[in-house]
Amino acid sequence: AHAIKEPLTERNICYYNKTRKRINKYWNDKKKNDKDLFIPADEENDKTQDMYIYEGLPVIAMKTKHDGDNILFANSETFNVGNIDNEYISLCCERPDENGEKEMYIYDCLIEDFRDYFLLNYCSTTHKSQGETITEEYTIYDWDGMTTKIKYTALSRAVKYENVYFGYGERE
């Protein structure tokens, strides 16, 4: 494992929401273009933040949405932004089919609904990352604020220990 000061990996896990927002802002600002769609934070919801939307942007659902018996997306499900037009933001992920094989799933979200359901996901809290397996390099922030059980959750997402970095977070 390695200790770093500047954000280095595009996948990150933290304990505090303040850290999550800071790391998400860092990567969103670094990757955005002037022409990208801007969606402001929802002042009524402190989990949200200003977002620039572009192809490839990682996002995470903050609640589940149903269409009858179908789950359109589940709380904590992760997506990448695909196509963006004047009305919709297309979100893509892989889901298991009835045989357990991975298949592409696409959800078209109305632009005006986007901030009600999705957050930036360059960084997610340990709570949101439970059950995930991370194959690429990632950084853990707020280590000192985590209990032993939460540290285990953050560390055990890794396929191999060499992929884990430790970043300097902020106390809330």
Question: Which ranges hold each PLM region?
Answer:
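Core RecA-like ATPase module of SF1/SF2 helicases and allied nucleic-acid translocases
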Residues: 11-172
